[in-house]
Amino acid sequence: MALTAEEAYLEELWREEDEQSEEATAMQQMLAHQHEQQHDALPSYQELMGQGSPAVTLRRAKAAAAANGTSSPGIRGSPSPARGPGGRLPSLAMGPTVGANVEQLKRRLQTVVAEVEGHQQRYDKVLLEANKATDLVHSMEAEIESLYVEAEELARRVPPAAERQRQVATWLAQRSAALEAQRQVLGGKQLELIEAEAALRAAETELDFMAEARNEIAAAQAAETAALSAAAATLRGKEDKAVAGYRRKQAAEAARLADVAAAAEDLAQRRIQAAEEAQAQAMERLKANTERIREGIASGRDLLAAEQSRRREAVLGLKESLAAVQADVAQQAELARVLQRQRRDLQEKEFGALVEAGMNPYEVFRRRDQEAAAARQHEAITSNIATRQLEVAAQLAREQEAYAQKLAARKREKKTREIFDREMGPAAQQARTEAYMQAHTVGGVSMLDPTGRVQPFPSEAVVVKTRRFGRGGAPEEVLQQQLQRLGDDTQPKQLLLPAKYRNTADTDAAAVAGLGRGGGSDDEDGMGSPPRSPSLTQQLAATQQSLTATASLAQQQQQAAGDRYKQLATRALTKHEQGLMEAAKTRHKGGIGAPQTQMGRTFGGDAFLPSPAVVEFKDFDVGRTVSASVQIINRSYKKNTFRVTGIPVEYCDVLDFAYKLPGYLAPGVSGEVVISFTPKAPVDIDTSLQLLADTGPFEVPIRCRTKRAALSVSPSAVDFGAGVTLGECATRTFTIANDGALEVEFRLDSPQLSEDERALLKSTANMAHLMTSATVAAAAAAAAATASGQGPRSARSFANMGVADGAAPETDTGPLVAPREERRLAHGGFTVFPCVGHLKGYSKVTFTVTFAPVVAAPAKLLLHASYKAPAMKRLALPHHEVTLTGTGRDVPVYVERPLIDFQCCMLGHLYRDVLVVRNGGKSAMKVMVVPRPELEGFFEFSPDFGFVQAGDSFPITIRFKPTPALLHACRKHVVEPEEEQILEIGMRLSVPDQSLPVPFTLRAQITNTDLLFQPPALDFGDCVMGERTAVKLLVRNPGRLPQTFGFVGLPSGLHFTPNDGFGYVLPGEALERLVSFQPPIAGPQTFSITAKTLAGRSFTLPCRANGVAPPVVLSSNRVRMPATPIGDTRTVSVVLINKTDQPQSYEFAVPADSDLTLSPHVGRVPPQSRLRVQIDYSPRPPVDGEQQGALPPPSAPNTARGPRDGGGGGAMANGNGSGGYEHYNDDGEPEDGEGDADGHTDTDSFQSPSARASPVQPLGRGGRGGRGGAAGEDEDEDEDAGELPVRGKSSSSSKASSGRRSSSPQLGGRQGLAMGRINEVPDDDDADAEAEAAAEAEQRTALAALKRIQSMGGGDPGWYRWREHAITCYIKPQSQNPTPSQSQSGQAPAASAPSDGASGAAAAAETAASSGPAAAPPPQEIHLQVATCAVLPDLVLLAPPDLPYVPLHQCHCLDFGPVPVGQRVVRRLELANEGEEPLVLGAESMDSREVFGLVNALRPVRPGASFRVMVSFTPQARTEYLEVLVLKSARTRLRLALKGAGIAPELQLGPEGVTATGLDMGDVLVGEAAARTLTVTNVCPFPLSFTMRLAGKASAADPNPTMRQAFSCHPAEGTLAQGESCEVAVSFTPFSQRPYFEDVLQVVVPNQQDQLLVPLRGRGWREAVFVAGPDYPEPQPDPFLLHHLAKQAGVALPPSVSGGGAAAGGAAVAAAAAGDKPSTPAPGIKPPATPPGGASKGKAAAAAAAAAAAAAAGASEPRELTLNFPHAIYPGEVATASFDVGSLKSTASGSAPGEVGVAELPAEAREAGWAVTDPPTAGAGGGGKVPLAAGERKPITLSYSAPAAPHPGMVAAYGHAEYRVLKLQLTLKGGLAALSGGPEGRKVVVAARCRLLPGSRPPGEPVPPGVTPAPEPVAASGPGAGAAGVKKLVPPPSPPKKAV
């Protein structure tokens, strides 16, 4: 594309500037590169210091090198291209920085500064550490000096303190060694300090060396700035030159634009001239049209004059026949009277005949009337069936037609698809492609060969076209041929045409609009006539066709604009994509416009205001260009400008705009834009003109509207008033207006027209004759019909008769066709003109309707107005309907209402009404009321005569005052039945100038004003103070009119429910009211109440009551629960207050269907205290068919009474099973007639619906009101189960269906009422199965109800359930209070009678008989009224099917199942908003441990939307978790039970109980091993890894120098899958002589909760024969292994070190003596079982080392072991203890038997009570030998018998505890290993110790095992008697031996 001169000049200027900028950039880069090279060649400070030459020497050397052309080593002498202004090279003054880069020099300087700071910090740190080390050395020296002083003092002390001297010496040695080490540290710190100081000094020196670089850096920067300023000045000069050249070019362009503007102005002048010429032509056409219209108006006036003359003639003809018609009518009336008289006579005769025949004439007549009514009903039903059959047939026809249309549509679609596939399918496309290739290639081939090495040239392969090919220059014949292929309806699309051809295309408006090209037709063919007798099918078809045409036209108009510019269907954007799109639009808008701010205010909105706001082109003509100007006004704060960006592309061919660039407009200044519209099709357009201002885009709406017809009818109903006299006519008009510009044709028609009347529309020659004949014929037919008794006929039938009979002779003449303008519609006396015509745009047509009645009857005509547009024949226009109504009358004077009905009238009241008399004639007439003598005094007419003016009315006032004498005076006017007391009195108005009188009828019904009250007196009985007691009062209205009554002047405490004593009672209705009374004081009270009515009547009722103070009162008797959503629970509470000095028992009887729970509902209130009772309301879901709203509320908060209630307190009339009382006589028995044989009262006439349901059986009441009846009750009992129970009557008890309790039988009479015992239902299998089935059914019901609630989102959101419940609280009388033991246990007292259902009544009777007349009074009652309201929740949980519902708690249960501890599981729940407002969700706080938690934040939920809540479960311990999640909105709380179990990694160890008993490895020789097997099983549902870990108990006495564990496990770790087991081998290998080895094996599992600990025990011996059980002495502590090393080396330690044998022995004895104190096990580790010896083995863990030390000290001394008796004894008791001896069997060396010799007990020991009881082979002194086989182990049992009385030599005799000691010597022989004692064996002494307590054992203290109580004293003498006595004692069974 070639550039203009201006563009080329600008390109050249900018190219030069780019070259200069590139040269400057290259120069700067070269300078920087050379600076870097010079910096690399600079020597460092260390190099300069190494050369030993200062900086000045280096500068001189460089200068000399530069002069001589040489360079020093390491420095490259390259010239620098950067020169100063004087041509000199810029250089730095300092030697090391000569020619260096400034930036690099800066960085180097910063690095040096950082190094100095770092060295300074290190120096400070090292200095601080050196100071600390110096202080420490000084302190240590001072401490050593003080120790030296103390050593000198100790040396001088007498006697010397050797131990202190040794300690001081040791401290001196330690402190001296530490001092030497600290001094070495101090020396190192000093050296480090010197090093840090040297580094700091070096860094400071280098910093000083670099100090001059700062000045040189500044100088270099100044030189660089000067160079840049010079370059900028050069660039500015070049820019000035470019600007000058651009200004010259701009001036040339302005001159060119001026020339263009001049040319445009010439073109505009030529257009204006053409427009003026077109306007002149239009004026001429308008003048011609106006002339034609005037001619049409003149011809119309002539036609109107002719029509008026014709109508005058017709009216004159009608007036001539008026006299004949009147005579005929009079004759017909006389005939009718004669026939009526004859009929009455015949009826009277038949009446007499029937009476004589003994029949009831009324019955016969009534049966005849009923048969006639049945016949009429049968006829109506038959007609209805026929109509329904027609409708069904029509529906079937419509369905068949729709089905046929669907089949046709499918066939058309299939055919279209086949044609498309045949013409546009792949095969057709391939064929067309091949044909095209064959026609346009040289060789006629369908494909070119692309495989050649050289591509073919197009000129060689294809046919060469002319230069006009593809440029719109095709020959005309080719274009015509293509257009013929497309068809006549196809037009070129303007959008696809070139711009120069768009305005020249000639399009057909009708074709484009899709309205057809059919030729014109007349009104019959084009508009058609409505059907004469249209059937339902035809009407529906016509309506459907019109709707389809309207919808298709609207769819065409809607899609007309979119057809030009279609858009591909795309998917809907997601929320994220919409956000991105909005952000992009915001960024785009910010880029194209900036906000305007003036003086701190930012302008918002569009900156320009168009005037007019909408550019509208109305009623346009296709092809005619219309222009509109719009002013664009700047309304912003500052100057602004705009430009037009265009019009949408789909409307560019019809809309255009023109404007001048406005420049910047000041605020308030406007610019003009001219919009031109050239319509090419009658299509509505809605678009806008897009403009862009500095502040952003804005638009001007454009609306283009075609010509349309807006038709309306006013009025739609034409009424001719009260009536028109026969022979006269009345005229009314209605108007059809067209508020649009489209001209339409209208036609009036009626479906009531007959064929002849339709033909009459087009004829005018015999119209008058036909009308006259029709009138005469109609009158004759009416007379004949009246004479024959057929009754009057309709106007349509008269017209048909006239046309059919009278017009027949004239048919031969042939009717003449009238012009369209003269056609009139006539039917039934109505004539409408005109009925056909044209309605131009913005005009209206007035239609004249004339009504000339031919019969005295009402007439009605329905007119249909249809329209069509001649210019748009396919346009469907709406139809209108006009209703014409009129009435024909015989005489001119008539009454407006022939029946004056006073309705129902009360006796003694005055009533008025008006009789309006109208005169339809042409002259005034006199009227008089003909009086009746029997009406005198009752009816009065004022005035009784008067004159009625022509066309006016005359009112006559009628006054009526009925009295009781009226019915007697007017008894002949009473109509049947006489009980109704209805009077119908015939009256007449006499008109002298009129031959016929005017009849009218007076009608009235008489009634009285009485009210009946039942009972006539109110007895409230005993009334509890503080609450209201109610009785029922029936108010009955015997009259026939409703009455309004009210009880006035009520005394204090009396209240009526409802409406506070005011009411409205209907005729014959018995209205029930609850009269409640709250006594203000205690005691009997008498008063009366008065009721008054609006009729002026007053009635008085006497009342009496007795006030009673209750022992327990409620804090509030009324409770209103808040509106509770279904699934939620609301809680309130009341307080029971006991004001007496005795405890009071109570029970609440809660209705079963109330959804209320009271807790506790049964209990006791302590004296002078309060008890809180909680009331929970959990509404159940609605059931199917349940209506919303409130049921009839209970009548009163207390019990209603019957009319015959006598004494006694009131009871509640509600659903709790309580009822009214009976009246008792003096003997306490019910009066006769008060109850039936079953003990029920007759209260059916006074029970409210709520009293029918008996909920919960109350405490102390019978089973009549329980939840279910007894099994043996019959139907009558079931029906009466809900009646009000009677106090004092016995009834069979019933079991509660809920299974919670069964009621006790009710006691009879007033002889006593026992409180009911609460019994639990037996827990058997059948009961469990039934309970489970009932629970499952309840759960299914609740789930179904919840689903209904969730599906009620589209239902009524205002559903609610309001109920009111009265709950009775029974207070047990004080005489039946429970015993103190029962009060303490908190149980309710039980009745003495059995509570089973079979014997309940008999037991109750027996109890009543036994109690006698002195029985306690019945329970007192107080009442609580609770109002509840249940609503639908707005927050609903969309629970999945697997989420169970708990009906008891009314919530879903989300079970996470077992989850490993520490693992997190997340579940999703979906909440839905079923309300009408957005919900803000919230949640109540949960457990702080965060086991259950909400993962996501709660967001607001829109109406109808849902929200997902994620709940997590993270167990922290191995336990079950249960928590309630409460999600709440403003009105609803949604409870969700969260359940889960934390399962820790758990392993099961086997054998069973191994963790408690442990593993006993047995007795093992040192060096050998023993093994046991342990089974580890994974019982968790996931794999587990485990590790075996030994606690490794250590002892100071046995330091384990070999570092070997006695116990080991294999495998020590592993991983087990779910259910997998593994065997672990535990080995025991003793490493030294230790009698007892103990350890704890811990099985470690990751994340375990409970420790798995297995105690391990074993015994290691170096010798085969051993003694197990006693405590071995503790060895001497050897922390430094001196004894062990000396024993290994065979060197004896000096006594000062070893402590000597005596010391060792003493230490061992002391340790043994201290062995009583048991060791405390480690926390969390279960201590092993205590051996029979009783002493703990924790402190004897190193017994082998003690034994070795004892053997080394002296082998001749026997080892002493300690055997402690496990329990202390008292005098006279016997205690036993045992230990084991055994011989080992070696696994390597075989086995050998052994022997243990037991020395004989000394005599003093036997006398003291010691004995050897086991083995029994011992002698009298206890001595003997115990043979031991290899591997055998035997027990030896010792017993001690305490003396019955301690002798004075014993410590116990003085009241202190003491230890009794026996030393038993054992000799160990044999075995595998050689004993240390030689052939004689090894001696072992067992010291047995038993603790003896003074006194005797307390009586309550049990005897421990192993202790025998003191026997009976036995007389004995001699020293051997005690021993003998001991021998005779039977030893107790040996305690279980300790497994070691």
Swiss-Prot record:
Coiled coil spans: 100-159
Ranges of compositional bias, category Acidic residues: 1227-1236, 1272-1282, 1321-1335
Example of a GO biological process term: axoneme assembly
Gly residues bias locations: 1205-1220, 1260-1271
Chief subcellular location: cytoplasm
InterPro entries membership: Ig-CFAP74_3rd, Ig-CFAP74_4th, Ig-like_fold
Compositional bias of kind Low complexity: 63-90, 535-548, 1287-1304, 1373-1414, 1913-1929
Highest rank taxon of the organism: Eukaryota
Pro residues bias spans: 1720-1731, 1896-1912, 1930-1940
Subcellular location: Cytoplasm, Cytoskeleton, Cilium axoneme
Gene Ontology cellular-component annotations: axonemal central apparatus; axoneme
Region (Disordered): 52-90, 512-548, 1159-1336, 1373-1418, 1714-1737, 1894-1940
Keyword annotations: Cell projection, Cilium, Coiled coil, Cytoplasm, Cytoskeleton
Keyword Coiled coil: yes
Stated family: Belongs to the CFAP74 family.
Protein purpose: As part of the central apparatus of the cilium axoneme may play a role in cilium movement and thereby cell motility.
Subunit structure: Part of the PDCP1 complex composed of CFAP46, CFAP54, CFAP74 and CFAP221; the PDCP1 complex binds calmodulin.
Protein name, as recorded: Cilia- and flagella-associated protein 74
